[in-house]
């Protein structure tokens, strides 16, 4: 079965652009890149020429005698004369380009030639994306795919755009959801927390209507990721990257979720592991949430590189790494146990990252003041609190009330509760997190009345 993705609309818009450049779709392994491109290709082109540099390494020779479009087309035709090139109606799809990054140099010449559309895809494991950038700057477009977000999960469940728009209207107008809406969406969101958004897992759940077999699929994905680390990481970094990856659930279970390299291995030091954390982030396997030096704008560059939290790029992978008893209890009884706070922080971090936000938090030294996340509007810095328990979001209210943080005027609290507003704090259900960026854009345009007139 094909799962509708947000990338579908992006690809259609890309094709309708008369000045389109070759496209590179990057992202972690097994998030649906190949399936999405194949679906788009078969519905939009008379001919599709697909080259997979992992499954068919013989095609790595197509750049041996040059990067010109005609040269590469000729070499592909020599290797397989059945592949047809129809000018103006052919998509050339280079898949798994991490196995042959040299192909990206050719994108400039395909752009200049203009006879064929080109899409590249790859996981970017073990290669320098900066090298690819330098080889194709000005002649390509980038797009990043991740696993399904909650909106795409709702699509898979059969909910249409009208349901999503109704959700968004509730947020903009600060109108609480009905009891039925809260029950339905909260239940669906908890299912999403357990399953995650990896297409194979979601598709299995949709086909069967149950969770049977999904844990096995999730754990196989973990094994595949661990194997990728062994395959692509080099030298002593291989063991270090695996240690960091495998230690994420343990560190998230702590009250203080800051990732501590010293707990990964005896004598471990950050300077030895810096590249390992960056490797995992670049691969898309994890999301890094960086500790701000001070809660003020701008966000970029305003952080301590030695302080960070690590979340999985897909929360379903976090679930898969729990022990059997915890994982079974979560599926059967929705009991999150000691992982409750970690689970909700993880799912919010994932939703924010998939919305295009970089992740930042703040912890004041020698103080209990700590804020889970920060986003921004055009003018203001906005703290985001994740409440797994009932509470008053004390740190957020301190940030809003204090004259020491003039760029913070209101905050957003995400919880299991309904929509509400009190003392400059807008409360919304967890399941609406994927709409937060859109809501703040509406605020910037004066179209979110509650945020424009917060209670004082």
Language-model-derived ranges and their functions:
Residues 1-14:
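N-terminal pre-Walker A segment at the start of P-loop NTPase domains
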Residues 33:
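Conserved lysine of the Walker
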Residues 36, 40:
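Hydrophobic positions on the alpha1 helix immediately C-terminal to the Walker A/P-loop
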Residues 55-88:
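Short glycine-rich substrate-engagement loop in P-loop NTPases that contacts/grips substrate
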Residues 117-123, 144:
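Structural recognition of the conserved hydrophobic beta-strand(s) that form the central parallel beta-sheet
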Residues 131-250:
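Interdomain motor-coupling "hinge/lid" segment immediately C-terminal to the ATP-binding subdomain
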Residues 203-378:
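Accessory nucleic acid-recognition modules appended to NTPase machines
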Residues 418-456:
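Domain-level recognition of nuclease-like catalytic cores that cleave nucleotide substrates
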